[in-house]
From Swiss-Prot:
Organism, scientific name: Trichodesmium erythraeum (strain IMS101)
InterPro entries documented for this protein: DHAD_IlvD/Edd (IPR050165), Dihydro-acid_dehy_C (IPR042096), DihydroxyA_deHydtase (IPR004404), DiOHA_6PGluconate_deHydtase_CS (IPR020558), ILV_EDD_C (IPR056740), ILV_EDD_N (IPR000581), IlvD/EDD_N (IPR037237)
Keywords, comma-separated and alphabetical: 2Fe-2S, Amino-acid biosynthesis, Branched-chain amino acid biosynthesis, Iron, Iron-sulfur, Lyase, Magnesium, Metal-binding
Quaternary organization: Homodimer.
Pathway assigned to this chain's UniProt record: Amino-acid biosynthesis; L-isoleucine biosynthesis; L-isoleucine from 2-oxobutanoate: step 3/4; Amino-acid biosynthesis; L-valine biosynthesis; L-valine from pyruvate: step 3/4
Gene3D superfamilies hit by this protein: IlvD/EDD C-terminal domain-like
Cofactor(s), by name: [2Fe-2S] cluster; Mg(2+)
Active site (catalytic residues): 473 (proton acceptor)
One of the GO BP terms on file: L-valine biosynthetic process
Residue positions, PTM N6-carboxylysine: 125
Protein name: Dihydroxy-acid dehydratase
Reactions performed catalytically: (2R)-2,3-dihydroxy-3-methylbutanoate = 3-methyl-2-oxobutanoate + H2O; (2R,3R)-2,3-dihydroxy-3-methylpentanoate = (S)-3-methyl-2-oxopentanoate + H2O
Note on how the cofactor is bound: Binds 1 [2Fe-2S] cluster per subunit. This cluster acts as a Lewis acid cofactor.
Length: 561
């Protein structure tokens, strides 16, 4: 079997002389036309610290591909900075960018008939976007994470970007002055790399390591450390070998691999966004996965790591303590991981973990021992009830009041909600409802980090609940329930809630309930009318037209056949 199984379609034979002529212009020589052509999907950008160091990694990937006997072709893909667009109209483009990234990588790799792809990403949507494309195309591939940022520091306290969001709430509540707010702002993000807690980017990179689509230890490395660049070059070598062996994503991204990823996400206390993204990746890989699967795994996997946003440490601390391989070995020792799942190296998960210790070092407390976990069960709970018949996603660890029944405060946008919080109009016992922020209704399913951080900063984190058909940042914690489906824009019950209604959030019973009679609910449903589309042209209009429910991953290519 030729190594250039796909690309020979454009490099072999007399008829391909014009194709080869153009390839010669970009550096191909006679001997290169039989080598596998490998795309390097480069998400470098200076709009965000998450991606500003990626170009250097892409160059190391190019070197690695060449050394291993492949022919690299570098191309760009996009990124949105979730942190910078947070709380603005621009955030509507964040989840949209996941699918734009997927479509762009698929378009280039298939348009150029590449033999494989090494994708490098940093900010939140880079990871799932790349993996959706990889699963769709089913050509040999590996993902390289751009790396995590190192923590900032102020008055001896580690900072992340979430510290700055929470400082806004503290300032508005009169807890800190403008000088301290400015100091936190200046020190929160000290250099290159993705947001430093177990937020969405680090959650998804950890998931990909657990799935076997990234190299061991690579998901928790700091962006600015030399080992990150070395790991990138090694990834290129591994990919070229995978092309020779024709190890395909369909052999790796299996039901077992995704279950392994979910187990690791629970153990590290990962982001709610992982639920949405793994559903979408599973769909692209033709793997059956539902919200109920997350709940089944959550019930049996403990939270082992003390990581921000609700914990103490950042991802670089996790790396120093033993990283994802140590967490995986602990899960494996307790039969909570599938050891026979294949990885891009050609080895199984079990084989890769053979020499990894099964207990965390005693001189650290980032990774807890099995008999003393942070929490006995996972933190990402699936809630259902008349407010979410398809389901909703809640973070339930670190919540002092796992059951709350309160007065609904209803807002039809994130901005209106944030204004009320900062103005002191939200009281203890309220349940905030933020709707028309779902995949179709936003459109784009914005993250509610600004309101939730303002709640924490105001000292109301364990005193109010917040539910939304939008999403939450990986930096969010507290009594929050997102991904409520069906969403308001399609007539879900969340659209029918009125100011002053009583709502129950019960994490123990996995319940999200609007406390009105079925008859009253049906009356409201009969008079509800859908809103006119907010956007009628451009990418947001297309997205709103195509996107599916968050309960199935908010994918844009469902039901097209």
């Amino acid at each position: 079997m030729p190594e250039n199984l796909r690309s020979q379609l454009v490099t072999k034979g007399v008829q391909r002389a014009p194709n080869r002529a153009m390839l010669r212009a970009v550096g191909f020589e006679d001997s290169d036309f039989t080598k596998p052509i490998i795309g390097v999907a480069n998400a470098h950008s200076t709009i965000t610290p998450c991606n500003m160091g990626i170009n250097d990694l892409a160059m190391r990937a190019v070197s690695g591909v060449k050394e291993a006997g492949g022919m690299p072709q570098i191309f760009g893909t996009i990124t949105i900075s979730d942190g910078i667009s947070m709380g603005t109209e621009g955030m509507k483009y964040s989840l949209v960018s996941r699918d734009v990234i997927a479509d762009s990588i698929e378009t280039v790799c298939n348009g150029q008939t590449m033999d494989g792809v090494l994708a490098i990403g940093g900010c939140d949507k880079n990871m799932p976007g790349a993996m959706i494309a990889i699963a769709r195309m089913n050509i040999p591939a590996i993902f390289v994470y751009g790396g995590t940022i190192k923590p900032g520091n102020y008055n001896g306290k580690d900072l992340t970007v979430v510290s700055a969001f929470e400082a806004v709430g503290e300032y508005s509540a009169g807890k800190i002055d403008e000088t301290e707010l400015t100091e936190v702002e200046r020190r929160a993000c000290p250099g290159a790399g993705s947001c430093g807690g177990m937020f969405t980017a680090n959650t998804m990179s950890s998931a990909f390591e657990a799935m076997g689509m990234s190299l061991m230890y690579s998901s928790t490395m700091a962006a600015e450390d030399a080992e990150k660049a070395d790991s990138t070059e090694k990834s290129a070598h591994v990919l070229v070998e995978a092309i020779r062996k024709q190890i395909l994503p369909s052999q790796i991204i299996t039901r077992k691999a995704i279950e392994n990823a979910i187990s690791v996400i629970m153990a590290v206390g990962g982001s709610t966004n992982a639920v949405l993204h793994l559903l979408a990746i599973a769909y692209a890989a033709n793997v059956k996965l539902s919200l109920d699967d997350f709940e089944i795994i959550r019930a049996r996997v403990p939270v082992l790591c003390d990581l921000k946003p609700s914990g103490k440490y950042v991802t670089t601390n996790l790396h120093q303590a033993g990283g994802i391989p140590l967490v995986m070995k602990m899960l494996l020792e307790h039969d909570l991981l599938h050891p026979d799942a294949l990885t891009i190296t050609g080895k199984t998960i079990g084989e890769q973990l053979t020499n990894i210790p099964s207990e965390p070092p005693s001189n650290q407390d980032v990774i807890r021992p099995w008999n003393n976990p942070m929490y006995a069960q996972g933190h990402l709970a699936i809630l259902k009830g008349n407010l979410a018949t398809e389901g909703a996603v809640a973070k339930i660890t670190g919540v002092k009041n796992p059951e709350i029944t309160g007065l609904a405060r209803v807002f039809d946008s994130e901005e209106a909600c944030l204004e009320a919080i900062l103005a002191g109009k939200i009281q203890a016992g309220n349940i905030i409802v933020v709707r028309y922020e779902g995949p179709k209704g936003g459109p784009g399913m914005r993250e509610m980090l600004a309101p939730t951080s303002a709640i924490i900063g105001a000292g109301l984190g364990d005193k109010v609940g917040l539910i939304t058909d939008g999403r939450f940042s990986g930096g969010t914690y507290g009594m929050v329930v997102g991904h409520v489906a069906p969403e308001a824009a399609v007539g879900g019950t969340i659209a029918l809630v009125k100011e002053g209604d009583m709502i129950t959030i019960d994490a123990h019973k996995r319940l999200l309930q609007l406390n009105i009679s079925d008859e009253e609910l049906e009356k409201r449903r009969q008079v509800w009318k859908p809103r006119k589309p907010q956007y009628t042209r451009g990418v947001l209009a297309k997205y709103a037209k195509l996107v599916s429910s968050s309960s199935v991953g908010a994918v844009t290519d469902a039901g097209l056949g």
